[in-house]
Amino acid sequence: MLSWYKAQLAARPLLTQAVTTSILFGVGDVAAQQLVDRRGLSNHDLTRTGRMVLYGGAVFGPAATTWFRFLQKRVVVPGSTNKTILARVAADQGLFAPTFIGIFLGSMAVLEGTDVKEKLQKNYWEALSTNWMVWPFVQMVNFKVVPLDHRVLFVNVISIGWNCYLSWLNGQ
């Protein structure tokens, strides 16, 4: 299975990572509804899961893939691996995270037919501050030990819990 996935990454990296992200965003929402909200299968909101799947595959997966490639090529401190890692984490947490938390919440509001401004005012700072408690460490590990082609997958696996949280927060 791993060799098949690696072959897909080599042949179609953007598509493979978009599909992977789509699936794992869906898993995060199912976990949020079934394990956190304890909705039960009969009360599972398939539309909500569909929104997460759509956002993961159409927005976050391609964006994260492109972002990690950009960081790899453009954010480099010559002669210092550790400073390069810190610079990438700073860029990720100072630019990508604040932007994509806003895009996530705004996208969910649009797909739900609710007010974007209200959604952002209600949830943005809580999501971003929680992000800053979790993701800087995760990204340090990601940039230090995970090969570029597997960084989105690594983030997606960790994101099962994070997406569970975001899905729960979005549903509040």
Curated annotation (Swiss-Prot):
<dbReference type="GO" id="GO:0005737">
    <property type="term" value="C:cytoplasm"/>
</dbReference>
<comment type="function">
    <text>May be involved in cellular response to stress. Required to maintain mitochondrial DNA (mtDNA) integrity and stability.</text>
</comment>
<keyword id="KW-0472">Membrane</keyword>
<feature type="transmembrane region" description="Helical">
    <location>
        <begin position="13"/>
        <end position="33"/>
    </location>
</feature>
<protein>
    <recommendedName>
        <fullName>Protein sym-1</fullName>
    </recommendedName>
</protein>
<keyword id="KW-0812">Transmembrane</keyword>
<feature type="transmembrane region" description="Helical">
    <location>
        <begin position="128"/>
        <end position="148"/>
    </location>
</feature>
<feature type="transmembrane region" description="Helical">
    <location>
        <begin position="94"/>
        <end position="114"/>
    </location>
</feature>
<dbReference type="GO" id="GO:0006067">
    <property type="term" value="P:ethanol metabolic process"/>
</dbReference>
<dbReference type="Pfam" id="PF04117">
    <property type="entry name" value="Mpv17_PMP22"/>
</dbReference>
<dbReference type="GO" id="GO:0005739">
    <property type="term" value="C:mitochondrion"/>
</dbReference>
<keyword id="KW-0999">Mitochondrion inner membrane</keyword>
<comment type="similarity">
    <text>Belongs to the peroxisomal membrane protein PXMP2/4 family.</text>
</comment>
<dbReference type="GO" id="GO:0005743">
    <property type="term" value="C:mitochondrial inner membrane"/>
</dbReference>
<keyword id="KW-0496">Mitochondrion</keyword>
<keyword id="KW-1133">Transmembrane helix</keyword>
<feature type="transmembrane region" description="Helical">
    <location>
        <begin position="52"/>
        <end position="72"/>
    </location>
</feature>
<dbReference type="InterPro" id="IPR007248">
    <property type="entry name" value="Mpv17_PMP22"/>
</dbReference>
<feature type="transmembrane region" description="Helical">
    <location>
        <begin position="152"/>
        <end position="172"/>
    </location>
</feature>
